[in-house]
């Protein structure tokens, strides 16, 4: 050939040669592209710029990197995109053959990566950083810096493997090129970089270790290489060692597992390389014996058919231990852990999960090509084994698993209810059976979010601490794992701790509200994952100005599981009734759905519900503006509005109320419910509405009317405010010490029968044999009949209850007598005249006492007559001790028996002491008889001021001795003289008594000594019947005239029921054997059952409220019922009973009472309600079901403050979809824009107002997702218009949602409590603020008027 020909020949060449060469290239290219899992790339010049063309943009945040690829102009189907990720690199293959990939600048969390489709033919990759807060200067590493981590070698059972020889005949020219390129010479190079031809087509997979049994004692023998030849093992060669290190030490993601066995196990190490065909370090398979002939033939056959030479021979009995499988896990409540293992196309017939107390093992086979490509040499018949050593013990018998199309779901039941904080046990503990486990250096699966949630990585400081804790664990492993566990960059350079980093937020145990799965028809998934600022369910609501009532209701309803799931995926649009005049045309339903999404996306710290408020205000003008309203009222209107928007009834028929007319209740109730559903049929009705039975009874004709009505919530009344009254109970016999009881009664509308009934149960005495009396100033103020009101009785008043003898028991008439005690001489000292105020000058001018009361003194009768008009109302004897009632049969009413009873009762309330006898005192027989008339006259004239007026001339004056001689200096005897009663509280003035000159008692009158001795008096047995009595007994008749009783021996006394008795103690010091007497605190025993009555006085239970709700009541006159039989309005008796209970039960505690426009009140008493297992079986008389109607609490609305101003908050949890006893998100406190976690024990407070209960084991079936035309076939062409209308409303509300700014802060503009104040308005409405302050000032003035005028009148009326 000529030179020119030789020069141009290679370019042009003969036509036949060029055509043959082109056809050969096309055939080779088609063969390579048709093979599944081929790791080789075809070096084509046109694919070199693919990477630059695909990469559109990338950006990073503190914890993730987002890469956007330009795929094309049309929609992208994620099913056709093949993406594989490791912690260091990735590769993305498109359906048209294009691909993108590379080695990242730093490590990522490959298990948390996401591939998302976007509008405009974009593909978005979300790559969570393994090291948060680490700034990446570039997305990919430069080509010259992608080096391996030196020093890692492959080992087996603690010994290094022999070096692997390079095959001499494997394209030496290519090997030289790879040797010059450090990046391509490593065992695992850049993936999909697209930097030049021949780049690897798939990602560098994690190292898999395959195990095969071999005879003990046999060494490793040659096996088939990539070309079908057995590689030889070289020894002590630098080149071989370097090749071994490059093969056995891939960076970061090499993971190896060893399976323990009784026989020796041979190690098979398989790794996908950069270029399987041309790489000099081709993967080999180490075996313990020569391959079988059948296997060798199979390998040759696969190579002849163009199979991948790097793939292992498929063996049905091979077992591959996996150190890591893509998974995540989360704790489902305190008792379970859910693990999701993401492997597709599982062969269910040969896959299973084995559970033990400390671990579980997943054994499976898969046909997923992407998974098999990550494990070279594995095929559909390969058995994979993944064993996880658990952090704590489990119950193997209660653990379950199930297979889905894309994953395996494993549910682990904890042995103890506690928080694990992670799934796997620390690496130093090893796996069960003695095998070592290579634990990933990244965060544990529980550190990631549950499925569907965004990543919540640790802060840099916490990540550094986590690495420091795991470093000694990795080093403590034996040498068998040194070549498996790769070091992370954190072990070289720990991130600098940031002192300003906030503490991590609580872990969310529930996935956020999921969106519809992305498909080829739907690529409009929101880009909200990158905007998350809080955990799902922790978004607050901004207070727009006294709108805390609305915020608390919305937060409670958003945690209603069925309602939340119903609105999350737009399937409710099929049920929107756009033509309902009572609704909003779907705007309220769609606005509520938009708000629910905002609360569960986690993209707002606080969201403004202004659009929903505007929609509600457009239908209910009372909610216009920013004034306070009742939360229950707003909740009822909101649910009713949602019901009307979702009402399935297009044309409501006319229905009438169904009455019983003697038919069975079951028939009438079902008929009434069906009639209600003819007009009201929606998801709100299915979820919230129940049915109760209303029974009306006419008081005149006894006509009974029974109807069945629906209810949305139960307004249960609270028991009225209670007061605790101390009651002193006296038994029928005086030898029993009085007992003090504490009885709770209502502050309003209480009667004496409540106290008598309560005491009757305590002392086991019939109520008709008890008498209740009030004591004021040591005398009976009044004796209550059972019907008498106790509203005017305060807890400080003294109430005595006496047991009386029953006439049925005595078989004769029983005499009941009131007895009061008083001294013969009052203990009040007299130092001056009551009329002229002149003090006593000398002994000759002694002041004379009034003989009626002995409490005042006068100079003469002139002063007495002058002072009588003023003294008349106060002239009464001085009483001491407590009065009491005695009941004696008429036949046994003797003086001795009466004296015995009186002395027995009196000793509990007075202290009596009789000093030793002194001979110098006057005897009774030596007294002048003239003084008897004086005393008799005085006694007859003694009485209350209510009797007939007495002229002053009829009164007698007695002359006491000088006050200096009254014995005021007398003291009690020493304590060693005998059992002297306590003198505490007894002053010297009380001991002083002025003796009366010449005024003795009746001569010769003696009273037999009662059987019971008076405390403080020491006497011998022979002198018991010889001493004088210590008191006298006087009879007081109906006209208040007193007469001293005489001892008639065994003859019964003649006393009527209209008289009373007075016990007069002989305390005149001038008389023989006088006594010292004074009042004392009543001696009594405390009732042990009343110890907690005071604490329970202000506490009620929900059962008590439900009992009041179901108790019959009489209708008020303005609510009178029209009796169809009497043809008149009657104040009938009405009773409500529960018949049908809903799935979600709302209970309103009626804390607010409105008596009038001015008089309003709120009850702040504690109502104890169960958080778990509210049993309503005793209140529900209707549905007889096998399962009891048990409910669990999931939300509470609280109200703080009073009627004028207050604040609403809410506590809620998100119950599990299948069990209301478990929570997917725990209890949180919603205080407007602030959301914090709370303990379940803090939910029950005295401020609870509205309770939300969810029924156990009674889920509500959601309606099937159908098109609007399918649900309403009668609409015809209007279905498309309705659907487009819903779409327009969605776009409008979502656009307004984006324009609404976020809340100003966690506390909102009004602080933690939004007491009434001016709302945040603009300057265009200044008059509204003035009007608001004017209204507030008026209300404050009315309150002050009530407190200053009406309250004193009410407080004084009780004393009248």
From Swiss-Prot:
The source's domain of life comes to Eukaryota
The topology of this chain with respect to the membrane is: Single-pass membrane protein
> Main localization of the protein?
endoplasmic reticulum
Amino-acid positions noted as binding Zn(2+) 1 in the UniProt annotation, renumbered to this chain: 833, 836, 859, 863
Membrane-crossing ranges are 1334-1354
For this protein's source organism, the top of the classification is: Eukaryota, Metazoa, Chordata, Craniata, Vertebrata
Q: Which residues form the CS domain?
A: 51-140, 322-424
In Swiss-Prot or TrEMBL terms, this protein is called Ubiquitin carboxyl-terminal hydrolase 19
Q: What is its biological role?
A: Deubiquitinating enzyme that regulates the degradation of various proteins by removing ubiquitin moieties, thereby preventing their proteasomal degradation. Stabilizes RNF123, which promotes CDKN1B degradation and contributes to cell proliferation. Decreases the levels of ubiquitinated proteins during skeletal muscle formation and acts to repress myogenesis. Modulates transcription of major myofibrillar proteins. Also involved in turnover of endoplasmic-reticulum-associated degradation (ERAD) substrates.
NADP is among the record's keywords: no
Keywords recorded for this protein, A-Z: Endoplasmic reticulum, Hydrolase, Membrane, Metal-binding, Phosphoprotein, Protease, Repeat, Thiol protease, Transmembrane, Transmembrane helix, Ubl conjugation pathway, Zinc, Zinc-finger
EC? 3.4.19.12
User: What enzyme class is recorded for this protein?
Assistant: hydrolase
Ranges in the topological domain labelled Lumenal = 1355-1360
What are the boundaries of the signal sequence? none
């Amino acid at each position: 050939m000529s030179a020119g020909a030789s020069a141009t020949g290679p370019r042009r060449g003969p036509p036949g040669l060029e055509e043959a060469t082109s056809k050969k290239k096309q055939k080779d290219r088609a063969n390579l592209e048709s093979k599944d899992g081929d790791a080789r790339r075809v070096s084509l010049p046109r694919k070199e710029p693919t990477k630059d063309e695909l990469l559109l943009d990338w950006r990073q945040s503190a914890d993730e990197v987002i890469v956007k690829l330009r795929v094309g102009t049309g929609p992208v189907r994620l099913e056709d995109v093949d993406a594989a990720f490791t912690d260091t690199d990735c590769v993305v293959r498109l359906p048209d053959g294009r691909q993108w990939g590379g080695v990242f600048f730093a490590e990522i969390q490959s298990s948390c990566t996401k591939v998302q489709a976007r509008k405009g033919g974009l593909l978005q990759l979300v790559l969570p950083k393994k090291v948060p807060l680490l700034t990446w200067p570039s997305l990919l590493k430069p080509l010259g810096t992608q080096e391996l981590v030196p020093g890692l070698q492959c080992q087996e059972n603690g010994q290094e493997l022999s070096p692997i020889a390079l095959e001499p005949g494997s394209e030496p020219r290519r090997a030289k090129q790879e040797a010059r390129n450090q990046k391509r010479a490593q065992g695992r190079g850049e993936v999909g970089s697209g930097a030049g031809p021949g780049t690897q087509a798939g990602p560098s997979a994690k190292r898999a270790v395959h195990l095969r049994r071999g005879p003990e004692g046999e060494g490793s023998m040659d096996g088939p290489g990539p070309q079908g030849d057995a590689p030889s093992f070289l020894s002590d060669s630098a080149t071989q060692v370097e090749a071994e290190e490059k093969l056995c030490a891939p960076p970061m993601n090499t993971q190896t597992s060893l399976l323990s066995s009784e026989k020796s196990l041979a190690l098979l190490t398989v790794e996908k390389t950069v270029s399987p065909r041309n790489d000099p370090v081709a993967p080999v398979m180490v075996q313990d014996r020569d391959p079988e002939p059948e296997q060798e033939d199979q390998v040759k056959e696969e190579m002849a058919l163009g199979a991948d030479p790097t793939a292992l021979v498929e063996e049905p009995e091979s077992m591959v231990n996996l150190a890591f499988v893509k998974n995540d896990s989360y704790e489902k409540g305190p008792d379970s852990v859910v693990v999701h293992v993401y492997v597709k196309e599982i062969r269910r017939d040969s896959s299973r999960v084995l559970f033990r107390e400390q671990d579980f093992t997943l054994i499976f086979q898969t046909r997923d090509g992407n998974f098999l490509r990550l494990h070279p040499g594995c095929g559909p018949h390969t058995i994979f084994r993944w064993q996880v050593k658990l952090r704590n013990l489990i119950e193997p018998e209660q653990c379950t698993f199930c297979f889905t199309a894309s994953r395996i779901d494993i549910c682990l039941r904890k042995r103890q209810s506690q928080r694990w904080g992670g799934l796997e046990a620390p690496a130093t503990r090893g796996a069960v059976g003695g095998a070592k486990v290579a634990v990933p250096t990244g965060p544990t699966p529980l550190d990631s979010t549950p499925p569907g949630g965004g990543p919540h990585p640790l802060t840099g400081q916490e990540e550094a601490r986590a690495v420091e804790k795991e470093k000694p664990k990795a080093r403590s492993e034996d040498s068998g794992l040194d070549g498996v566990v790769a070091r992370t960059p954190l072990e070289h350079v720990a991130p600098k701790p940031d002192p300003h980093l906030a503490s991590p937020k609580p872990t969310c145990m529930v996935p956020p509200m999921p969106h519809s799965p992305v498909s080829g028809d739907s690529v409009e998934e929101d880009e909200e994952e990158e905007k998350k600022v809080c955990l799902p369910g922790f978004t607050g609501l901004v207070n727009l100005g006294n709108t805390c009532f609305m915020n608390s209701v919305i937060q409670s309803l958003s945690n209603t599981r069925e309602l939340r799931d119903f609105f999350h995926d737009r399937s409710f649009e099929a049920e929107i009734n756009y033509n309902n005049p009572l609704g909003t045309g779907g705007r309220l339903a769609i606005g509520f759905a938009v708000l629910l999404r905002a609360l569960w996306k986690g993209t707002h710290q606080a969201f403004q519900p202004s659009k929903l408020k505007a929609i509600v205000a457009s239908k209910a003008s009372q909610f216009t503006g920013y004034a306070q309203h009742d939360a229950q009222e707003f909740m009822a209107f909101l649910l009713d509005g949602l019901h009307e928007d979702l009402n399935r009834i297009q044309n409501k028929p006319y229905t009438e109320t169904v009455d019983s007319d003697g038919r069975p209740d079951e028939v009438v109730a079902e008929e009434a419910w069906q009639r209600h559903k003819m007009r009201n049929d929606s998801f709100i009705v299915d979820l919230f509405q129940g049915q109760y039975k209303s029974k009306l009874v006419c008081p005149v004709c006894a006509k009974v009317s029974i109807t069945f009505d629906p209810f949305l919530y139960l307004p249960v009344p609270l028991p009225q405010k209670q007061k605790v009254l101390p009651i002193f109970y006296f038994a029928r016999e005086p030898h029993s010490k009085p007992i003090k009881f504490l009885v709770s009664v209502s502050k309003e509308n209480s009667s004496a029968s409540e106290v008598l009934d309560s005491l009757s149960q305590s002392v086991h005495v019939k109520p008709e044999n008890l008498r209740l009396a009030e004591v004021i100033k040591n005398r009976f103020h009044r004796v209550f009949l059972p019907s008498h009101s106790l509203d005017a009785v305060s807890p400080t008043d003294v109430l005595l209850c006496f047991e009386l003898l029953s006439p049925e028991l005595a078989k004769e008439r029983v005499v009941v007598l009131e007895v009061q005690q008083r001294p013969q001489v009052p203990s009040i000292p007299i130092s001056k005249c009551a009329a002229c105020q002149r003090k006593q000058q000398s002994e000759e001018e002694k002041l004379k006492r009034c003989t009626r009361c002995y409490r005042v003194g006068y100079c003469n009768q002139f002063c007495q007559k002058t002072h009588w008009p003023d003294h008349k109302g106060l002239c009464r004897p001085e009483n001491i001790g407590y009065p009491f009632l005695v009941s004696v049969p008429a036949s046994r009413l003797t003086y001795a028996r009466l004296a015995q009873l009186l002395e027995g009762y009196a000793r509990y309330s007075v202290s009596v002491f009789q000093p030793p006898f002194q001979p110098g005192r006057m005897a009774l027989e030596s007294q002048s008889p003239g003084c008897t008339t004086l005393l008799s006259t005085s006694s007859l004239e003694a009485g209350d001021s209510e009797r007939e007026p007495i002229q002053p001339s009829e009164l007698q004056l007695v002359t006491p001795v000088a006050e200096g001689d009254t014995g005021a200096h007398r003291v009690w005897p020493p304590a060693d003289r005998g059992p002297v009663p306590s003198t505490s509280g007894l002053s010297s003035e009380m001991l002083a008594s002025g003796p009366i000159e010449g005024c003795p008692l009746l001569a010769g009158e003696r009273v037999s000594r009662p059987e019971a001795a008076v405390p403080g008096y020491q006497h011998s047995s022979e002198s018991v019947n010889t001493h004088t009595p210590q008191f006298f007994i006087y009879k007081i008749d109906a006209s208040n005239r007193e007469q001293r009783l005489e001892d008639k021996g065994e003859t019964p006394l003649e006393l009527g029921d209209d008289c009373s008795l007075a016990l007069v103690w002989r305390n005149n010091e001038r008389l023989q054997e006088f006594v010292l007497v004074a009042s004392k605190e009543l001696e009594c025993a405390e009732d042990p059952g009343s110890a907690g009555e005071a604490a329970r006085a202000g506490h009620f239970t929900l059962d008590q409220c439900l009992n009041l709700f179901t108790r019959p009541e009489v209708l008020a006159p303005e609510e009178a019922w029209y009796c169809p039989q009497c043809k008149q309005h009657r104040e009938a008796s009405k009773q409500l009973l529960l018949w049908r209970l809903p799935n979600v039960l709302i209970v309103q505690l009626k804390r607010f009472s409105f008596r009038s426009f001015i008089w309003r009140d709120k009850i702040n008493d504690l109502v104890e309600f169960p958080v778990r297992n509210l049993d309503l079986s005793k209140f529900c008389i209707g549905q007889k079901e096998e399962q009891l109607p048990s409910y669990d609490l999931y939300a509470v609305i609280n109200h703080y403050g009073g009627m004028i101003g207050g604040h609403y908050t809410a506590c809620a949890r998100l119950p599990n979809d299948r069990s209301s006893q478990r929570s997917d998100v725990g209890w949180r406190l919603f205080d407007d824009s602030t959301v914090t976690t709370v303990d379940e024990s803090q939910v029950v407070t005295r401020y609870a107002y509205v309770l939300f209960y969810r029924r156990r084991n009674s889920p509500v079936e959601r309606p099937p997702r159908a098109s609007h035309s399918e649900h309403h076939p009668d609409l015809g062409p209007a279905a498309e218009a309705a659907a487009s209308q819903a779409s327009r409303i969605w776009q409008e509300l979502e656009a307004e949602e984006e324009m609404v700014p976020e809340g100003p802060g966690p506390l909102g503009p009004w602080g933690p409590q939004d007491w009434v104040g001016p709302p945040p308005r603009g300057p265009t409405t200044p008059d509204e603020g003035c009007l608001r302050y004017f209204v507030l000032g008026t209300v404050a003035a009315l309150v002050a008027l009530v407190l200053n005028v009406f309250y004193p009148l009410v407080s004084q009326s009780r004393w009248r």
